[in-house]
Amino acid sequence: MEKPRRKKRWGRRKVRWAVMGVCMVFVCISFVVSSIWSDTRRFSKEKGRKAQVSERTFGPAEKKRPETEKTAEPTTEPTRKPVDKTLQIYTYLQGPKSWNQGIDWSGEWGESYMDGGSFGGFGCGLCCMANIYSSLTPYQCSPVDMYRYAKKHTGYGGGMAIDWGYIRRGLTSLGLHCHVERKQETYHEFRENIRKSKCAIVLVSSANSTVHWKNTPGHYVTIFEFQEKTDKVFLADSGDPDHNRRWIHLKKVYRSLKTASNWQYLVISGYDKQKDHWHHKMANGTWNRPSYLKAKS
């Protein structure tokens, strides 16, 4: 009769190894958990330290700006260009050559005969009057308009150069304050008169000086915008397109004043609209109007 088999039991050695294995597993798990906890704690400490540094640097209420954010540059207004007053100064030309060449400010009147005389030969004074009236008042006229006005209101007969008396009488009736002058003994006195004026009509002659005008027995021109720093004036010369609308030194004008005439120049000191009996609104006739000249309302 067979004996019943006994169940095998683990030996002491095997139990010892099992216990050691369990302990090693527990130690490994503890090490891993400890490492993770340590890293987490160290990360939180570093984060807290950075926050403290940030607060010390930027203050508690100030947040550090992103690196990509740029400081807005201050806006600057564009510099405005100074207004060129000469663009609204009228500078009519009187002769036929200017008209045939199509030069700005020339007109058909350059080829016209009026009361037996060629306007291109005698119209310089009337161009000066038209320049002044159109430049200093809200109104405008052409040299032909001024010719007709002077004939009707001043006693000027037409067909020839206009004299100082008719020029002064005509401009006064248009509300312009003006008076005639003789050449002063010194340039300083002449300069002071021009400095205080709005503009002036001057009578020049190459018989007195050829510093600027050649072959010119007698010729009316207009001068505007005296510059105190340079002693220059803006010249309106109806007889020469190369002279017209140029800046020249006032001393050249002074030296060229025609002393053979009773009067050498006429100064304009102001304008009174209420004393203007004309209020002429159109520059009539066929002429080459510059593109830069603004239309008057």
Feature locations, PLM:
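Active-site-adjacent structural segments surrounding the nucleophilic cysteine of cysteine proteases
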Residues: 14-23, 28-157, 294-297
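Extracytoplasmic/periplasmic, Sec-exported soluble proteins
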Residues: 116-125, 138, 158-163, 182, ...
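Mid-length scaffold segments of soluble, non-membrane domains
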Residues: 141, 148-183
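Active-site-adjacent substructure of cysteine-protease-like catalytic cores
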Residues: 183-234
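Noncatalytic regulatory segments and standalone regulatory/sensor domains
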Residues: 226-297
